[in-house]
């Protein structure tokens, strides 16, 4: 019935009511993930912070751009004290009465969640041969925490199996190869609540490349958002009064967090009946991060405020390079349900994998 409007947090249930017809979408970097149109005919995304009337966005309620004001911190020590106070409050408020889990990598972000929330079950993915930090993961943990550590070691064949299983359940392309790690964690999580550290890199300056980018007001120069819509770039630039560095990080937030990671975590956790929680995406933390001076985010070290919080418990020697949920995306190609000749470029190959595997997938 054309008069019926279905609103749902994922695609799969909608396809129980309509005939699913896949339509082609442009795979240019990750920009397609913030388009209103989904890869399914007549299924569109709604925009957060807007009131919809008769299926169309009519009234602005709130926006992340409204949270940006002039920086209030003039020195980094003052900024850190505010961060520490807000972080303590947010993590305390977010701690559930029931048992909870944490996606733990040994990195700065998940570590400062671990240090502020007690009795978490820990879930770690070891993409064999990809993540050297996993080999010393127990160095980060107390004896009690070690008893709560669950490590899932995944090879190329297993990665491909999990990828295909995930794709046939979520009914959407995998916007990032990190989705498979999240899928495995949620699949094995025995708690009703699972914490993650998504968003910290984009909000607090976690990408090393930020230190070397030649920021330009003409558009984002970040590889994560350089193909983003001009209208969105202009809005980000305006929100920061023409500061190209701040605008670029906000563009990355829109693409990487709103478009990919946060949406993927919500979708995958929901598939397993789990509630994801993330202190970094709590409004008080986001407001602080969005209004930090640029040099308090992009400095001689990455994420200086989060790094400082990490060093309150752990030694500097444990700040190690990591690749997170890198996965075996390209290495698993021989075992996946899509065949093509490699381009020789891993990122280009991944785009083809993500697109072809979705359009070729026979959803169950």
Spans of features found by a protein language model:
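Cysteine-centered catalytic environments shared across enzyme families
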Residues: 1-165, 169, 192, 308, ...
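Adenosyl-5′-phosphate
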Residues: 42-43, 178, 195, 219-364
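Short acidic-aromatic active-site loops that bind/stabilize oxyanions
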Residues: 73-84, 171-175, 247, 251, ...
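Short, hydrophobic alpha-helix immediately C-terminal to the catalytic nucleophile
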Residues: 111-115, 183-187, 287
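ATP-dependent adenylate-handling ligase core
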Residues: 128-184, 204-219, 242-243, 291-298
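Active-site nucleotide-sugar/metal-binding loop of Leloir-type enzymes
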Residues: 187-190, 197
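Short acidic/histidine-rich active-site segments
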Residues: 194-207
């Amino acid at each position: 019935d054309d008069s019926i409007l279905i609103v749902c947090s994922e695609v799969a249930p909608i396809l129980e009511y309509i005939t699913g017809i896949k339509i082609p979408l442009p795979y240019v970097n990750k920009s397609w993930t913030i388009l209103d149109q989904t890869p399914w005919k007549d299924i569109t995304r709604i925009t957060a912070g807007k009131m919809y009337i008769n299926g169309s966005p009519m009234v602005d309620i709130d926006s992340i751009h409204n949270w940006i004001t002039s920086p209030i911190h003039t020195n980094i020590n003052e900024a850190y004290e505010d961060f520490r106070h807000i972080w303590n409050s947010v993590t305390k408020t977010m701690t559930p009465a029931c048992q909870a889990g944490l996606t733990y990598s040994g990195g700065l972000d998940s570590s400062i969640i671990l240090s502020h929330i007690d009795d978490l079950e820990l879930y770690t993915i070891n993409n064999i041969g990809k993540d050297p930090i996993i080999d010393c993961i127990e160095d980060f943990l107390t004896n009690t925490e070690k008893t709560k550590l669950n490590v899932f070691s995944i090879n190329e064949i297993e990665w491909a199996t999990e990828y295909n299983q995930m794709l046939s359940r979520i009914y959407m392309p995998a916007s990032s190869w990190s989705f498979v790690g999240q899928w495995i964690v949620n699949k094995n999580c025995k708690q009703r609540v699972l914490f993650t550290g998504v968003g910290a890199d984009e909000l607090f300056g976690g990408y090393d490349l930020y230190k070397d980018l030649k920021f330009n007001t003409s558009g984002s120069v970040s590889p994560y958002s350089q193909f983003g819509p001009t209208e969105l770039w202009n809005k980000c630039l305006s929100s920061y009064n023409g500061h190209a560095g701040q605008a670029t990080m906000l563009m990355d937030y829109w693409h990487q967090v709103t478009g990919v990671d946060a949406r993927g975590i919500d979708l995958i956790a929901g598939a397993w009946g789990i509630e994801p929680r993330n202190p970094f995406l709590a409004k008080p933390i986001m407001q602080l991060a969005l209004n930090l001076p640029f040099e308090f985010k992009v400095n001689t070290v990455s994420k200086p405020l989060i790094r400082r919080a990490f060093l309150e418990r752990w030694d500097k020697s444990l700040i190690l390079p990591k690749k997170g949920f890198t996965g075996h995306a390209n290495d698993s190609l021989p075992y996946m349900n899509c065949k093509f000749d490699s381009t020789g470029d891993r990122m280009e190959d991944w785009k083809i994998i993500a697109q072809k595997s979705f359009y070729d997938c026979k959803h169950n």
